[in-house]
Every structure is written in C-alpha cells, then in structure tokens.
C-alpha cells in the first residue's frame, strides 16, 4: 500500500523537523509552500519532502489544499492531509493499513485539537483527513472539507491512531473572517459555515 502525506505551509520552519519525523512512516511527503520567507521549503526538502512553491491569490484554503493534493502521485492508495503544527503518535501507519478496505473512502481517527495548561488533552474529536486518492476535492474558502464524487463517502474508524495539534499561537487568524463571509455568500445554506461565522 502506498501512503502519501500532503500539506500546505507558509513560514513554518520551527515545526518542520518534528512534523517530518512524525510523517516518516509514509512512503512520500508532498508539500505546497505558499510563499515562505523563513526557509521552510528548503528545510523540508533537506528532510526528504517533495516541495512545490506557489502563491495562492486570492487566498483560499480549499484552493491551496486542492493544489497540494495534485502533488500526490496518481498511484497513491491513501492520502493523509495534515498541517505542519500537527503530529501523529508513532505507529499510525500500521493501524491505517489494517483499517483500510475496498470500498472505504476515508478513515476517521482521534484528533487532539488543543492541550490544557497542565498538559492534559483539551478538545478531542474524530478527524477525517485520510482518504482515497481519486474522486474527491476540497471545498470552502476556510474550514475546508473534502467533498467526494458519488454521494456520501464510506468511512471507517481507526482505533489507536491519534493526531495531535500543537498550534502556533503567534499566527494571526485574522484572515478567517472575510473567508467565512465568502463561504456563507457562496453557500448560504451551509449550516456549518454559518455556525463558524
């Protein structure tokens, strides 16, 4: 089974080493850098990632994710979308391979969105960014989700796989509001986007 991790990034050099170590169980790592000025693409390449640099104007997360997905080879069996401030607990690949089966479109796994000041897990929920290579695309300018061809995707839960989010608190999220407004304008009946707004 060929498993490929893909991601988008911009100025995330401090996370590169930890992230690449965590993703090393994959067969390949593909990254779309959207304009770093801190050496992120060079460091990722030194660590073995295949990096493409391309600005996205106007900025939309779905466009960036779709362009990063295009970097994944067509012969990949599974795609794993993560961000550079996320890390898998070791041993994730074996569990992902065991859970995958014909007819499955995506896998659901445990996601620790944040940690409390004392180090305990904060918000935890099921995440769904491990998916088949073909017949899906990212939608929504922000808080993007995968949309699958052919109706509702078949999902399977993976026990024992956990992705941890260690957010960069210094990064502004100021761009999110206009993107949320655009998302609601594009799809006013999308209750998820209305909720975020």
Regions found by a protein language model. Name each.
Residues 41-71:
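Conserved donor nucleotide-binding strand/loop of the catalytic core
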Residues 22, 32-43, 56-57, 83-86:
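A conserved acidic beta->alpha catalytic loop
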Residues 26-27, 48, 76, 104:
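Short, well-ordered alpha-helix to beta-strand connector turns
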Residues 70-89:
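Short beta-strand-to-loop acidic/aromatic patch adjacent to the donor-nucleotide binding site
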Residues 2-4, 28:
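Cell-envelope/extracellular polymer assembly enzymes that use nucleotide-activated donors
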Residues 14-17, 38-47, 91:
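Acidic helix N-cap motif at the loop->helix transition within catalytic regions
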Residues 7-25:
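Short, well-formed alpha-helical segments that are part of the catalytic scaffolds
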Residues 62-70, 88-197:
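Catalytic-site signature of metal-activated, phosphate-bearing donor transferases
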């Amino acid at each position: 089974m060929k498993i490929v991790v893909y991601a988008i990034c911009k100025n995330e050099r401090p996370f590169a080493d930890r992230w690449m170590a965590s993703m090393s169980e994959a067969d390949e790592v593909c990254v779309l850098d959207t304009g770093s000025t801190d050496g992120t693409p060079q460091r990722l390449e030194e660590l073995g990632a295949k990096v493409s640099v391309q600005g996205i104007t106007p900025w939309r997360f779905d466009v960036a994710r779709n362009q990063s997905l295009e970097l994944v080879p067509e012969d990949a069996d599974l795609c794993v979308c993560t961000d550079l401030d996320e890390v898998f607990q070791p041993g994730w690949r074996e569990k992902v391979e065991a859970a995958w089966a014909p007819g499955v479109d995506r896998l659901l796994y445990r996601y620790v969105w944040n940690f409390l000041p004392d180090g305990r897990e904060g918000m935890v929920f099921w995440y769904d960014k491990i998916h088949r290579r073909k017949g899906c695309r990212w939608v929504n300018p922000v808080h993007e989700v995968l949309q699958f061809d052919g109706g509702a995707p078949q999902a399977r839960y993976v026990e024992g796989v956990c992705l941890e989010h260690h957010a960069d608190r210094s990064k502004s999220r100021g761009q999110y509001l206009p993107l949320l407004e655009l998302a609601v304008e594009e799809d006013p009946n999308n209750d998820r986007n209305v909720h975020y707004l």
